[in-house]
């Protein structure tokens, strides 16, 4: 394990001081080249060429020379990976090329369907030729196959070969600037090897090898610090440290797998050639990859990787398939926010058995009531699980989960633990069935479950502590009461400090109380008080919308305001009266009745009126004609020129109800390309089927307008 440069050990031990600048400059450059080479051998090729002590000697000498000759220090020097002063926060970065997520596949059928769609999109005859052609290696689409790493997605921007920016994926459009932290990761080159393009954005994954994770946790435990539950959390937590000196001490690694912006050179012809090019530039690229043809090639790669998944030195949660030719990727394009040319094939989640000690309900920020199984602790999917979601009451009944049961627990998608099934032969005699409560465990309000909905909800939206923050943010938003300055941070403090419990409490706030909040100066507090004061005068439809009644959006709020004219009439309306309102069906009517039937909500509304919240009232108006009232439509597939949302708006504007599933009560199904099972069911039930042109003709025949004309 000797350095390949002749005389390396002798040079490494030579004193640093006393060298003339010209000689120092040459020595500094040689040391940097040597350290970069050894970093590449160690972190990329996993083939170290010198002992750690010799590497440390080279590094120490370079540090000393740069201290003696500060004019020679450059940002891409290996010594600059140690981290600088702590940050107060991360800046936001807008990705020039969005970092899109991938569609997931979980079965062989998902993979063959993906291959079929790619072949069809590329005009391959094999796609239409049936099963035999689909699996033909000669005719099949060529794919690049690689691992799906369980880490943190990252974008590295190099300009003229030098790392200038690193950003997290974020929401795909914008991420966080973590450049100072990423510069401490030795696996990531600060300067690319060889000729480099003017701009190169490399997409990849920051992760932690299992061996490094174990060592880190051992050090954390020895120091009495918090340990991490899995390598992914350790990697994400390490990378998002505001103090880069902490990141520098964490054993983070990186694999490159994608391309963002590129300037100065032509794009490679294939994805596999791109990865080879990354490796040539000194970027770490995983060698567990292959180029295959057709669906069978994809499935073979998936099974081979699955067989050795546990033996890999890092965590993965699946494999990724991408059409290999970049020109074909462009031809296939994107659907929604995911590429058509790629698929993430997830591994089955790991499963274990444990005992249900209790079943409780949790109240979400929108009032959703979710049964949660309290479990005997069990280690599954890399973490210790003590709770698992049961989703809703129907799922509890369908799975027949009792308190005391032995159940199979799975980490769905390796993230959210869920109860998969009950081991009935182990059910004890004293097992107890779950009973859904009728009152909210947080605020005591009535729990409702609307027709055709699986989720039960707390009706105390204006009073419930679990929904408090969300209710206040909704109340204050621009389209509701328009209270500028009442954002997430302010609401969080107001609620957490017990200052505000309901929207009515907002109108009791003064400048002094608000100015005492974190990051709220007197001027900001004054502006917020003025905005709250201005909101006392509003419109009826804005007030209705601000209440956050389930299923009552802006358009429905306008219809209710026009129809009733006065709040008192709306509050006492029964379902029959509400069904007279344009675009209000049984589900919406029931939701409104339940909301105003909850005394807690009425109490808050009266407090708001007492606080001076007011609006012009008017006399009720006659209901506008709805030519398709009473008709139920179902939309399926992709329409040629209309989005599904636009088609839904047009139908609802004409008075129709748009449902999500086909039944005997369905009047029409509007079908586009790739309609699927809904079309099959419609044909089996004899439900009339329209295409887009037929739907538009029907709307025209009844005199219905375009979407938005009735808003």
Swiss-Prot record:
Zn(2+) binds at residues 440, 443, 458, 464. It is an enzyme of class 6 (ligase). Keywords: DNA damage, DNA repair, DNA replication, Ligase, Magnesium, Manganese, Metal-binding, NAD, Zinc. It comes from Cupriavidus pinatubonensis (strain JMP 134 / LMG 1197). It comes from the Bacteria. The lineage of its organism: Bacteria, Pseudomonadati, Pseudomonadota, Betaproteobacteria, Burkholderiales. This is DNA ligase. Residues 623-711 form the BRCT domain. Residues 1-21 are annotated as: Disordered. GO terms for biological process: DNA repair; DNA replication.
């Amino acid at each position: 394990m000797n350095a390949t440069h002749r005389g390396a050990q002798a040079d490494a031990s030579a004193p640093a001081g006393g060298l003339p600048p010209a000689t120092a400059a040459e020595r500094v450059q040689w040391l940097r080249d040597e350290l970069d080479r050894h970093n590449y051998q160690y972190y990329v090729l996993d083939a170290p060429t010198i002992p750690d002590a010799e590497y440390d000697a080279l590094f120490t000498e370079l540090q000393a020379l740069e201290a003696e000759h500060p004019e020679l220090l450059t940002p891409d020097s290996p010594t600059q990976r140690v981290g600088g002063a702590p940050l107060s926060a991360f800046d936001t970065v807008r990705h020039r090329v969005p970092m899109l997520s991938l569609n997931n596949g979980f079965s062989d059928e998902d993979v063959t369907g993906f291959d079929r769609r790619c072949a069809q999109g590329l005009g391959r005859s094999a796609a239409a030729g049936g099963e035999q052609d689909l699996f033909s290696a000669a005719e099949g689409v060529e794919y690049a196959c690689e691992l799906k790493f369980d880490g943190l997605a990252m974008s590295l921007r190099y300009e003229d070969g030098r790392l200038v920016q690193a950003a997290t994926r974020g929401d795909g459009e914008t991420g966080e600037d973590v450049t100072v932290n990423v510069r401490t990761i030795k696996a990531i080159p600060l300067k690319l090897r060889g000729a480099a393009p003017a701009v190169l954005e490399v997409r990849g994954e920051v992760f932690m090898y299992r061996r490094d994770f174990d060592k880190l946790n051992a050090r954390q435990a020895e120091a009495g610090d918090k340990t991490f539950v899995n390598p992914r959390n350790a990697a994400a937590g390490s990378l998002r440290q505001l103090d880069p000196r902490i990141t520098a001490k964490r054993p983070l690694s990186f694999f490159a797998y994608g391309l963002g912006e590129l300037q100065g050179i032509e794009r490679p012809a294939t994805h596999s050639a791109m990865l080879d090019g990354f490796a040539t530039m000194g970027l770490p690229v995983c060698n567990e990859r292959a180029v295959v043809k057709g669906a069978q090639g994809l499935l073979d790669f998936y099974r081979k990787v699955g067989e050795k998944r546990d033996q890999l030195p890092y965590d993965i949660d699946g494999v990724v398939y991408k059409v290999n030719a970049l020109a074909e990727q462009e031809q296939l394009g994107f659907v929604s926010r995911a590429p058509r040319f790629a698929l993430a094939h997830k591994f089955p989640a790991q499963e274990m058995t444990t005992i249900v000690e209790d079943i409780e309900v949790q109240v979400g920020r929108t009032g959703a009531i979710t049964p949660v199984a309290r479990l005997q602790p069990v280690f599954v999917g890399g973490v210790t699980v003590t709770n698992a979601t049961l989703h809703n009451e129907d799922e509890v009944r369908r799975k027949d989960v009792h308190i005391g049961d032995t159940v199979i627990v799975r980490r769905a998608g390796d993230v959210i633990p869920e109860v998969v099934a009950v081991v009935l032969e182990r059910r004890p005699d004293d097992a107890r069935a779950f009973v859904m409560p009728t009152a909210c465990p947080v605020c005591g309000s009535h729990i409702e479950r609307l027709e055709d909905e699986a989720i039960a909800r707390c009706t105390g939206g204006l009073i419930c502590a679990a929904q408090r923050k969300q209710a206040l943010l909704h109340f204050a938003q621009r389209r509701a009461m328009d209270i500028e300055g009442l954002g997430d941070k302010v609401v969080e403090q107001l609620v957490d400090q017990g200052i505000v419990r309901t929207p009515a409490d907002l109108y009791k706030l003064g400048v002094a109380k608000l100015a005492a909040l974190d990051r709220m100066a007197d001027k900001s507090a004054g502006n917020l008080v003025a905005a709250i004061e201005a909101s006392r005068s509003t419109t009826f439809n804005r007030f209705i919308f601000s209440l956050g009644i389930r299923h009552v959006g802006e358009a429905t709020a306008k219809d209710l305001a026009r129809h009733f004219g006065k709040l008192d009439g709306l509050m006492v309306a029964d379902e029959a009266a509400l069904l007279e309102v344009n675009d209000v069906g049984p589900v919406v009517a029931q939701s409104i009745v339940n909301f105003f039937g909850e005394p807690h909500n009425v109490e808050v509304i009266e407090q708001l009126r007492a606080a001076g919240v007011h609006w012009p009232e008017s006399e009720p108006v006659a209901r506008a004609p709805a030519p398709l009232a009473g008709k139920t439509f179902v939309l399926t597939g992709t329409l040629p020129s209309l989005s599904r949302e636009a088609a839904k708006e047009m139908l609802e504007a004409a008075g129709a109800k748009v449902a999500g599933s086909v039944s005997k009560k369905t009047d029409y199904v509007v079908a586009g390309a790739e309609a699927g099972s809904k079309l099959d069911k419609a044909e089996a039930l004899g439900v009339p089927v329209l295409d887009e042109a037929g739907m538009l003709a029907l709307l025209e025949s009844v005199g219905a307008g375009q979407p938005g004309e009735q808003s």
